[in-house]
Amino acid sequence: MKEKDLSRRKFLTSTAIIGAAGMVAPALLSSCSGGNGNSKLTPLKQEGEYYVPELPDKAIDGRELKVGVIGCGGRGSGATINLLDAANGIKVTALGDVFADRIEDLRARLRNDKQQEVADEMCFTGFDAYQKVIDAGVDMVIIATPPAFRPVHFQYATEKGVHSFLEKPIAVDPKGYRTIMAAAKQAQAKGLSVVTGTQRHHERRYVEANKQIQAGLIGEITGGNVYWNQGMLWYKERQPGWSDMEWNIRDWVNWTWLSGDHIVEQHVHNID
């Protein structure tokens, strides 16, 4: 092997260095909630390279924002708490889900953990709940329903001029993808903010590692493989009285028509 070629040992050594560098990324990336206040929050972007976001610890204070949550299960609840932790002046004002028990679980969590109360008349159930949440005077929505439903929900939010946090995956089939892309162009034309839940793309250690790679730390990358080894996320036993549809939706991660299966639903993080 020529000296300029990258050996396995050199590669492992370099990736260990990158891992160590990633641990100090929070100190390297500017924050809009602390420090000397000189940061202009300019995204880190190089000519010809793809967008690399700046990752502040907390959002800049501004006017109060009213937020609606569409899909109040585990991911919707988690994203809602994440949002409240990440910024001041956030008020969750509307909740929507096919199932009332999901809404009540999130209401209780908001009440107990964040001292926020969502009024009865602002809680909506059924397959049209997303429309009622979006029409309830919110500034932005968290869209965390099963992936198959997200294109239609995002399309409606965009039509109504509402900003969106859209969980990944954004779609599970070509039709859904085309719906998303058409709505995205409309959102851009309207000046709406749209963020997707691709966590690797927004994780400080990964961002810092990418910066080191782009700087040439491990040399030219000519190829690679992406792996994700994992067992079952979870499984919902069918309960007496559940219809086929209710069982599918409550157990959505295990049904390809709703989740897109492992590559689309989970492995998309690492592919991204």
Question: What do the predicted segments below correspond to?
Answer:
Residues 68, 141-142, 172, 198, ...:
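A generic structural signal for short
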Residues 99, 125-127, 146-150, 171-173, ...:
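Short, solvent-exposed turn/loop segments enriched in Gly/Ser/Thr/Pro and often Arg
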Residues 175-177:
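Rossmann-like NAD(P) dinucleotide-binding subdomain of oxidoreductase/dehydrogenase enzymes
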Residues 71, 76, 190-196, 200-272:
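Predominantly a Rossmann-like dinucleotide-binding segment in NAD(P)-dependent oxidoreductases
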Residues 2-162, 179-191:
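N-terminal glycine-/serine-/threonine-rich beta1-alpha1-beta2 phosphate-ribose binding loop
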